[in-house]
């Protein structure tokens, strides 16, 4: 779903198997955005998608959370988000890197 949908708009999408905070930070620093399927935790009780869009110098990130605007207005710990990725997944999830090239 994610790969096919974003590829249809000419975006490059890669399923990420190294879901460490260090790798996610490197992807963000290289200009990618991340699509993350979240499990139960700080952002959701059931699971939903967020965009991890920007990393700050302190290592925290900004997200786009369609279920809760307030979550999109504050910094988040990247390790926390990686820890709360959905554990049961398919179709290349729960983490994808997206770029324009």
Language model: regions and residue ranges:
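Noncatalytic regulatory segments and standalone regulatory/sensor domains
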Residues: 29, 33, 55-101
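Active-site-adjacent substructure of cysteine-protease-like catalytic cores
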Residues: 7, 12-70
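Extracytoplasmic/secreted envelope proteins and their assembly/folding machinery
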Residues: 3, 21, 25, 49, ...
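Cysteine-nucleophile protease catalytic domains, especially the papain-like/related folds used
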Residues: 1-15, 93-94, 98-101
């Amino acid at each position: 779903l994610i790969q096919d949908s974003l590829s249809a708009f000419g975006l490059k999408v890669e399923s990420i198997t190294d879901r460490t905070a260090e790798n996610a930070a490197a992807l963000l620093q290289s200009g990618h955005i991340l699509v993350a399927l979240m499990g139960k935790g700080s952002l959701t009780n059931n699971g939903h998608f967020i965009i991890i869009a920007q990393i700050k110098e302190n290592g925290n990130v900004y997200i786009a959370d369609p279920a809760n605007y307030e979550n999109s207005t504050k910094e988040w710990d990247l390790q926390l988000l990686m820890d709360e990725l959905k554990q049961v997944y398919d179709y290349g999830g729960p983490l994808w890197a997206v770029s324009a090239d």
